[in-house]
Amino acid sequence: MSLSIDVTSLPSISSSIFKNESSSTTSTLSGKSIGRNEQYVSSDIEAFNKYMLSKSPEDIGPSDSASNNPLTSFSIRSNAVKTNADAGVSMDSSTQSRPSSNVGCDQMDFSLTKGINVSASLDSCVSISTNHKKEKSKKDKSRKHYPRIEADSDYEDYVLDDSDSDDGKCKNCKYKKKYFALRMRMKQVAMQLIEDL
């Protein structure tokens, strides 16, 4: 974006300084000038008191106490340049007042370079891995695993005793031999403990 201002078509500059007395000076730039009315007011304690008393407490804000000194704030604002609105600068300069060539034409160029480079690349990767365990069959669930107990008999030739077993319930049982062997061994261990005591 480029903005060009041709100062040859601007009005004349006139500045008036007021401090109990006024004087007028005029300066010319490229045949034309800018008009502005400036007024400076010296800080006055009475003017400050009138200013503060004329405002309600609700209207007094941080801008009234610059540098934590209200008198300094009042002096800063009262000494500020006051521009006359009637002597404003018009940016709509007529093309008839411009010369046919750029000779004698002062130009001010304001160049604004604004570059916006936005790179919005979003890489997203979602990986979901699920491992399903094989479901055991109903047979495996209903089946209970007991620890295996093995017992060896001290006697190679021993006779199974059916005297304390229920009639007809433990015939041809494959665990009967191991049961009696384990029972005999437990009896021997118990007898040995009694003897040791």
From Swiss-Prot:
InterPro entries: Rotavirus_A/C_NSP5. GO terms for cellular component: host cell cytoplasm. Residues 17-36 are annotated as: Disordered. Belongs to the rotavirus NSP5 family. Plays an essential role in the viral genome replication. Participates, together with NSP2, in the formation of viral factories (viroplasms), which are large inclusions in the host cytoplasm where replication intermediates are assembled and viral RNA replication takes place. Orchestrates the recruitment of viroplasmic proteins such as capsid proteins to these factories. Participates in the selective exclusion of host proteins from stress granules (SG) and P bodies (PB). Also participates in the sequestration of these remodeled organelles in viral factories. Residues 17-30 have a biased composition (Low complexity). Mg(2+) binds at residue 92. Coiled coil: none annotated. GO terms for biological process: viral genome replication. O-glycosylated. Its cofactor is Mg(2+). GO terms for molecular function: ATP hydrolysis activity; magnesium ion binding; nucleotide binding; RNA binding. Homodimer. Interacts with VP1. Interacts with VP2. Interacts with NSP2; this interaction leads to up-regulation of NSP5 hyperphosphorylation and formation of virus factories. Interacts with NSP6. Participates in the selective exclusion of host proteins from stress granules (SG) and P bodies (PB). Also participates in the sequestration of these remodeled organelles in viral factories. It comes from the Viruses. Its main location: host cell. Pfam families: Rota_NS26. Keywords: Glycoprotein, Host cytoplasm, Magnesium, Metal-binding, Nucleotide-binding, RNA-binding. This is Non-structural protein 5. It comes from Rotavirus A (strain RVA/Human/United States/Wa/1974/G1P1A[8]) (RV-A).
